Amino acid sequence: IHQEPIYPYILVEHGADISANYDRTIINSSEYGNFEIVKYLIDNGADITAINEYGFTPLDLSSKNGHYEIVKLLVECRASIIKTDNLTLILASENGHIKIVKLLVENGADIRYHNNYSLQLALKEAIVKS
């Protein structure tokens, strides 16, 4: 089991800018499903639109890895669901996370987006996996 260290709490308490650079902490915590750290970071001003070196946001990574509660939190905090490539929805679909797909669609993701063939395949795959 991957666990994030306690350091974000210590850094924030000592005045560190947790949004500096790529904000690896919120990205990694979202990817590995550490809800409490993600919530703490958001409550203390972390950038929910941070992008890692591969172009993924916290919402992308939590959707890809099936971390529903983190996805829900990020959506509630107005993380961008609609991107030019519909990547977040594709990642959730490809990995069979129907509950996350439903949440994303209910909050504005468009499954008909430009007749995106890869999205259609991903949605079919998600249904098969569920």
Swiss-Prot record:
It comes from Acanthamoeba polyphaga mimivirus (APMV). This is Putative ankyrin repeat protein R886. Keywords: ANK repeat, Repeat. InterPro entries: Ankyrin_rpt, Ankyrin_rpt-contain_sf. It comes from the Viruses. ANK repeats lie at residues 21-50, 54-83, 85-113. Gene3D superfamilies: Ankyrin repeat-containing domain. Transmembrane segments: none annotated.
